[in-house]
Structure formats: structure tokens, C-alpha cells
């Protein structure tokens, strides 16, 4: 299986927006090359996580090796790297692109170019990829291939005159894709006699084999029994197994330059394998590591707490297991007066947060409370100290803060021009600054700078609802800027509830505070005494709601008689309530927490 020379190897990835048919095209390529029999085929073969199939998205990058006999009679090895399309998994995309020389750009012929397609194409262009445009779903009545070709040329600047016309669902034209891979993509370069250099593309944990590493060999040969070294940590291991995915794991003797495959070397934890690291031979190490890719930095943080306090250790183990398969996910232990012991977790974005939460509840059967997502702020104190703030509850008093900087993003929004007005209004409500606005046919492309804090709550949902689902959105980080930000504390019966505090711009603080107080008033059960629910900035109260007391009719047992008897009982009740208000503790039920934290901002 490994005797295919390097000039007949093609490494490629598929770039597409969500739902443009990327995983379906991968299925057809696997079927046409006979990698799996018809009996073994399932839809979305490479999306092997139940969650991926259910949501129709690709989360983890997957690889598969296909052998294809081309029209010139020669057998080629095609290594397909299936990449995610969603903005939160851009890190997975950058890894996949670093391992390939070319890309198929799949665009839905009825919908045209979307924002996430753009972001990934620019990454591929930066990685010097040869890009082959493919128009999918040309069999649909709504398909407009000529308009979409023009759009590819105008928006991306790629020549689309020889774009391939296919329907991945029916299999129409998929054979032309295989031929194009052979004729239009370059072969990898590499020297089999040089020092071993292999790029660590991904790693995941297998319960039986330990850590499995996905590699792309650049130079040298990787073989079973070899002693290898990780160049970033200096750790050494002996290779137990070398193989390729076709798409099942298939052991081979060696991996040669230009090939992609996996190795298993009895590594205990994925923390020992840094994605983007260079693997070399321990006896004859390479002098220089390969250019890796940028490590991922979490941009959204939130607290995760078990509803049942006994599940804390189980949550720690579960987070550790997810971290094994997801290098971009961070967590550290923290405690909250209201919620007990839990973890502060860092994510690449909101979809990433949602996926991790869902995996915790499905795969590990955990019931969790998540605090409101927040971003990382940079604090400059008056004594010259600089802090990074992940948790709003840790924000110091305003008197010692010189300035606060918040992260901004540069967002690209593609939308049919009928909905442009609503989108522009939404962006300006969220303190957006317009950078660019261009028209391509009947679609507009708006580029905005927005504070990330305004995007993490419900911006994506609002964007979809004001554009009836037609807008697509993509962003990249765009530095930090000083801003007038305040911490809003929520007080229940004059006690601060740390889990509900949040940071907002001063202009929106009062409104947000009022909303959360009103929501809590509905959710907290009434007590025997009055409860004040307040929102405060420092010591200044900006919003208040009062939850009325339950009243017990203490005079019910008095039939007739003197009024002073009734008055005495009422006075006694009043005294008791006053004392209760002073010493009474208000238990906020978990359902109230969940609802308040889920509240649309």
C-alpha cells in the first residue's frame, strides 16, 4: 500500500460553508474509490461523532487515504483532510491546511459564496494552496451556476471559468473531481533520505491504544519500532504502530515523505503532544523544526458547575478527557459562593462552548450550570500593574482601575440586500464601527468592527432572526481597545450573588441591570419577608425590584373582642418579619440561576 511514489500522492482538503455539501462530497469520493463497500457506507462517514451527524457540522478534522486509478492508467494516493467549516473551529482548519498542498473549494450553486467560505479560502491562499472551485448541488431547480461563478471571481478573485459542476448527493460529476485532483493539484515535495520531519496534525485519546497521533511526513521515513522525539518538549517515545486511515485504521510498515497517517507510541496523555509540533528521529534529530501553526487562544470564558456537588470529581475527569481530544479547550478550578466548586473554562467561541457542554451532558451524563459567557479583559491598575480578567467577579474596585481594554473583532457579514438595513441597525446597536460595504450581485458584504463582548451573548441568533436565516457571519480577532466598562453586581436581600455579576458598557448597564432584576423577581419564590433584588455598579444602585412577602393571617383566631388584641398580634408579626429580613437567607433555586443566565441580553 505504501509503494506509491511521491509524485503520485495528492494531499487535499475540502473548504466549504456549513451545509454546502462537504461531508457528502467526501462520502462520494470514498465510495467511488472503493475505500468502503456499499454495505459499510453510512452518510457522513467522516463525521463519526454523534453530535456532528445530528447538527450536520464537522467538529474534528478527519483524514482518509483513497487509492484511485486515474485515466492515465496509474494508481494515485489521495489523502483527504476533512475540515470543519464553522468559525470557532478555524484552528482545526489551519492545521488541516498546513498538512495539504491543495484545496477543493465547494460552493452551493443555489446559495453562492458565504462568509465562512471566505475566511477559510483566505487561509488556504496564505498557505499557498492550489485551489480548485467546485459548484455543488447543480441539480437543484434554484441553482444558478453562472451567477455563482461570477461571484467566486468577484469576491474571492479566483478564476472560476473551469469550475467543476457536480451534485455530491446524486454522484453527478464526482468522477471529474477525482481527475482534477490528479491533474490540477501539485504533488508534495520531500526527501526520503533526509532527517525525519513529520508535522503533528492532531491527536486524540483511544481507551485501548492510548494517544493516537495524526502526522504528515515531510522528510525522512517513519517506521514501526523507531525511537522518535517531540521537538518542542524533547520527550522521546518508541513507535508501536504506524498506519493510514482508509477510512478504517489500517497498519502499514512505513510512512514515506508526502504521506499522511497515524502513529501510536504508548503516550499516556494528549497534553504531551502539542499540535503543530515536529516529530523527528531521536538518533538523528532534525536541526530545525517545521513551521508550526499558531496555537489557539480561548476568547470566550464561562464557569461550569455541577448541579450535584458530588459530581465535582466526575466533572474534573470528564473535562480532562475532553481536553485529551481538543487542544484548544482550557479549564481551571474555581469556587463560587452561590454555586460551590466548579471550573472556569475557555473556548474558541460560542459554538465551541455549546458543543463542549452538550458533550459533557451526553458522553459523561453530567447536569451542569453554566454562568454567562464573558471575554478576557485587560486591566491597567493605578499602581502600574496589568491583569487579565477572565471572571467578572474578580474585578477590583473602580477606584484602583486606570483603564480597561476589551477585545474587538473584525466581522464579515454576507447578506441579501433586502435585509441589509436590519443588519446595519443591529451592528450599530452593538457599538459596531462600519469598515466596508460592497455589493456583489444582489448580496451585500458588510465588514464591521465590533466589541467581542457584544457578540458573545446572542448576536448570532439575532443576526439570523433579523435576516430570516439568510445572513452568514465570520470573524477574526482584531486587538484590544480601551472602553468605558463597568461591573454590574446583582444583590438579593443586600447580598451579592457572584455567579450573576457581569461586565457591560456603561451605556447599556442600566438596561441590562433592570432586565435581570425583573427576570429574577419572576423566578425567586416568595418568602415570608420582603426581598429587594438590586443591580449595582460599585455602591450605586442602578435598578431595583421588590419581591412582596407572603402574608399569614395572624388575626384569624380573634373573633370579635378588642381591636388592641389584633393590633398586638400584627405588631408582633411586623417585628418578626423585620428580624427575618435582617437574618433571613434567601435560597435562590437552581432553576432561577439557569433561567437568569440563559436570559437574552
Swiss-Prot record:
Example GO BP: positive regulation of translation
Binding site for GTP: 19-24, 136-139
Keyword Protein biosynthesis: yes
InterPro entries (UniProt xref): EF-4, EFG_III/V, EFG_V-like, EFTu-like_2, G_TR_CS, LepA_C_sf, LepA_CTD, LepA_IV
Localization terms from the record: Cell inner membrane
Residues covered by the tr-type G domain: 7-189
Gene Ontology terms, MF aspect: GTP binding; GTPase activity; guanosine tetraphosphate binding; ribosome binding; translation elongation factor activity
Pfam families, per database record: EFG_C, GTP_EFTU, GTP_EFTU_D2, LepA_C
Catalytic reaction(s) noted: GTP + H2O = GDP + phosphate + H(+)
SUPFAM superfamilies: EF-G C-terminal domain-like, P-loop containing nucleoside triphosphate hydrolases
CDD domains: EF4_II, EF4_III, LepA, lepA_C
EC number: 3.6.5.n1
Keywords, alphabetical: Cell inner membrane, Cell membrane, GTP-binding, Hydrolase, Membrane, Nucleotide-binding, Protein biosynthesis
Membrane topology summary: Peripheral membrane protein
An annotated GO cellular component: plasma membrane
NCBIfam families recorded: lepA, small_GTP
Protein family per UniProt: Belongs to the TRAFAC class translation factor GTPase superfamily. Classic translation factor GTPase family. LepA subfamily.
Job description of the protein: Required for accurate and efficient protein synthesis under certain stress conditions. May act as a fidelity factor of the translation reaction, by catalyzing a one-codon backward translocation of tRNAs on improperly translocated ribosomes. Back-translocation proceeds from a post-translocation (POST) complex to a pre-translocation (PRE) complex, thus giving elongation factor G a second chance to translocate the tRNAs correctly. Binds to ribosomes in a GTP-dependent manner.
Record protein name field: Elongation factor 4
